[in-house]
């Protein structure tokens, strides 16, 4: 829609007015303000997982080895029978361009029949690659066994590979791919948007302070008694009875901006990869850390035992092992950090690797020096 613009205002004056208006709008919200829609969701408005079993055809000799995957042949025979093609019993089909796959998708909330959704296709046999394949019509079922969608289309595989003369080169993964918009929704999931003119907001992260601030913001905008906190995660909100008014109410409510409470201090440690992530609330009390590495090196080298001249002995080969223990000098470091940057800087100063940080952080938590919740995933 085009709005008429008066030509009596010069361009610089109009631009200055727009900048001033934008500045007032920018400073009307706190710097860390977030919308309610980014902090909470409406109960019942959620996706549903779908799954299906199907066949991918058109592969360039990279499909399942049907001798080792009998379910692929069984699925193919069943499909051909449904199409009116009968394969003689006992026929040994050695196909290399067919692969059995699992198809998964997420049914979006409030999805309607006819809507297209993305699907992920993953090989479940011994196919070497799904690149260039086409997924045949596959029903997608929910947890209740009902069909909610049908998938079919050409696969988009991000990987690439080549092999010749015993050499093989592969980039990324070849046994899984996606079909953007490859499934059509056939059935909608019934959603009851609240009961008795009441809906429930569920915070993404439990926090009593944030729940109280959301309640205060909603009651300030729509009147006292509109919202009430049930606990640190759930908030009950009264909505208009008519559906069109309810949609307008929810649209305005979820756009309200509030200042969420500061997240609790937390340190996340991935024990498999050695990754350590800390938020800004993580602090460290004054403590001493002794950091040193103990290295054990065992080396084995062959030794030739040569018999003496004019003797009846034989030359033999023996093994001689050397064991050496090295211990780097530990450094007693005083650490006291008030923020995330200082904590990381202090730990890096003693030469700690990510794997060393796992042990250091656990010891600091046990000693009471780490003022944060330590979570190992």
Curated annotation (Swiss-Prot):
The terms describing its cellular component in GO are: bacterial-type flagellum basal body, distal rod, P ring; outer membrane-bounded periplasmic space
Q: What does this protein do?
A: Assembles around the rod to form the L-ring and probably protects the motor/basal body from shearing forces during rotation.
User: What GO biological process, any one, is recorded here?
Assistant: bacterial-type flagellum-dependent cell motility
Family per record: Belongs to the FlgI family.
User: Where is this protein localized, as stated in its record?
Assistant: Periplasm; Bacterial flagellum basal body
Signal peptide (from-to): 1-33
Q: Which domain of life is it from?
A: Bacteria
Report the GO molecular function annotations. Answer: structural molecule activity
Query: How does it associate, per the subunit comment?
Result: The basal body constitutes a major portion of the flagellar organelle and consists of four rings (L,P,S, and M) mounted on a central rod.
Cystine residue pairs: none
Gene (UniProt):
flgI
Q: Give the organism the record lists.
A: Nitrosospira multiformis (strain ATCC 25196 / NCIMB 11849 / C 71)
Quick one: where is this thing mainly located? periplasm
Q: What is this protein called?
A: Flagellar P-ring protein
């Amino acid at each position: 829609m085009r709005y008429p613009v008066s030509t009596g205002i010069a361009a610089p004056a109009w631009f200055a007015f727009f900048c001033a208006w934008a500045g007032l709008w920018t400073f009307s919200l706190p710097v860390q303000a977030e919308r309610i829609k980014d902090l909470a969701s409406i109960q019942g408005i959620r996706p549903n997982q779908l799954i299906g079993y199907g066949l991918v055809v058109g592969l360039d000799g990279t499909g399942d080895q049907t001798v080792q995957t009998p379910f692929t042949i069984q699925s193919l025979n069943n499909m051909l029978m449904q199409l009116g093609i009968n394969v003689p019993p006992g026929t040994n089909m050695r196909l290399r361009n067919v692969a059995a796959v699992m198809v998964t998708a997420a049914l979006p909330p409030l999805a309607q029949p006819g809507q297209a959704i993305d699907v992920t296709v993953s090989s479940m046999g011994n196919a070497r690659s799904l690149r260039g394949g086409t997924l045949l019509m596959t029903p997608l079922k929910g947890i209740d066994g009902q069909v909610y969608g049908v998938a079919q289309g050409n696969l988009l595989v991000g990987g690439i590979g080549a092999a010749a003369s015993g050499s093989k080169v592969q980039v990324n993964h070849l046994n899984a791919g996606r079909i953007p918009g490859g499934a059509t929704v056939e059935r909608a999931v019934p959603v009851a948007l609240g009961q008795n003119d009441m809906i429930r907001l569920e915070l993404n992260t439990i926090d009593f302070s944030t729940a109280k601030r959301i309640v205060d913001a909603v009651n300030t905008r729509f009147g006292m008694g509109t919202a009430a906190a049930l606990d640190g995660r759930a908030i009950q909100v009264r909505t208009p009875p008519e559906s069109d008014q309810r949609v307008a109410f929810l649209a305005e409510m979820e756009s309200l901006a509030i200042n969420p409470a500061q997240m609790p201090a937390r340190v996340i440690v991935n024990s498999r990869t050695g990754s350590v992530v800390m938020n800004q609330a993580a602090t460290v009390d004054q403590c001493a850390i002794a950091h040193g590495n103990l290295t054990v090196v065992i080396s084995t080298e062959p030794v030739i035992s040569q018999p003496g001249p004019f003797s009846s002995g034989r030359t033999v080969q023996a093994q001689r092992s050397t064991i050496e223990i090295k211990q780097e000098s530990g450094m007693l470091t005083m650490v006291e950090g008030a923020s995330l940057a200082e904590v990381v800087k202090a730990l890096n100063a003693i030469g700690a690797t990510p794997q060393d940080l796992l042990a250091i952080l656990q010891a600091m938590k046990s000693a009471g020096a780490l003022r944060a919740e330590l979570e190992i995933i």
